[in-house]
A protein has these predicted regions:
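Tubulin/FtsZ superfamily GTPase core signature
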Residues: 1-111
């Protein structure tokens, strides 16, 4: 049995790499700079300044009402509540996506 990659518009796989928090955003920035192609990059953060310098194609500021763009202050509970607040934005970014890779540092509040 042979396997191959089909070509054509119906065979395109929509892949997203999502960087969450400062560490995840750093990974996304590095992947963009290295020329990684064939994927869409999304930066997700509570810190508005970090998003402003992100190289990601799509940027989602989560917890805008809760953190006022100031970050989660290394508090995972603030990060969780921020994600819940922005659930609809996150879901919209994932529409029509076939595969998602999430990168996060796991050392602060958001990632």
């Amino acid at each position: 049995m042979a396997f191959g990659l089909e070509t054509g518009p119906e065979s395109v796989v929509n892949i997203k790499v999502i960087g969450v928090g400062g560490g995840g955003n750093n990974v996304v920035n590095r992947m963009v700079r290295s020329g990684t192609r064939g994927v869409d990059f999304v930066a997700v953060n509570t810190d508005k300044q970090a998003l402003n310098v992100s190289s990601a194609t799509y940027k989602i500021q989560i917890g805008e009402k809760l953190t006022h763009g100031q970050g989660a202050g290394s508090d995972p509970e603030v990060g969780r509540k921020s994600a819940e607040e922005s659930r609809n934005q996150i879901a919209k970014a994932l529409e029509d996506t076939d595969m998602v890779f999430i990168t996060a540092g796991m050392g602060g509040g958001t990632g």
